[in-house]
UniProtKB/Swiss-Prot annotation:
Residues anchoring lipid (S-diacylglycerol cysteine): 25
Spans traversing the lipid bilayer: none
Protein name: Uncharacterized lipoprotein SAOUHSC_00053
Lipidation (N-palmitoyl cysteine): 25
Amino acid sequence: MIKRVNKLVLGISLLFLVISITAGCGMGKEAEIKKSFEKTLSMYPIKNLEDLYDKEGYRDDQFDKNDKGTWIVNSQMAIQNKGEALKIKGMLLKIDRNTRSAKGFYYTNEIKTEKYEVAQDNQKKYPVKMINNKFISTEEVKEENIKKEIENFKFFAQYSNFKDLMNYKDGDISYNPEVPSYSAQYQLTNDDYNVKQLRKRYDIPTNKAPKLLLKGTGNLKGSSVGYKKIEFTFLENKNENIYFTDSLHLEPSEDK
């Protein structure tokens, strides 16, 4: 009888040990993912993007020794109301640390998918440059609304704040060492600082609080080949989609 009890106790102890190790591994990977993103997100907010001319980023053997690198920043909002096309507006900017110049484009898109048809992409690009932290069109823009949107545009990196990133809990963690790829997703509330900032700047047609997705590929410790992006998903189903995406990373300059 005593032997049976001892075996039962031993079995329960082993079960708890396995559960603890598994949970610990999951928590460890979540912490790694957060730490990987924190390297960049801790810089937010970057109110003056020209500060990036003097900001170092992750470098590996993909960089020429004389290349300081180019920061690529991209922010976009996508909204699809029921029965309508997916409408996207955003800006991509390349901030060259070698030439201390920045250029890119503001873009709009309407993606329509009719039954049994391939999605139709209608992207328009409006070339821009950045001078004194302001965006200026380098070609004539006839649409007055687009002119204003370019002049008033702010990248997410300029107004967001992730000081509480390490406090996010109960994330849905995914890690594939073969690719490698990784992600962590968190349910936010409408009281979250960054959610408030997005609602302040965009007409978001839902009161639902978004999920925050931290997603990347490449080495968790750093890679110029992979990518990292963050996404706020307010609504996602067959007929309606509302999401905001942002990315900021340093990559080798094109002319080096």
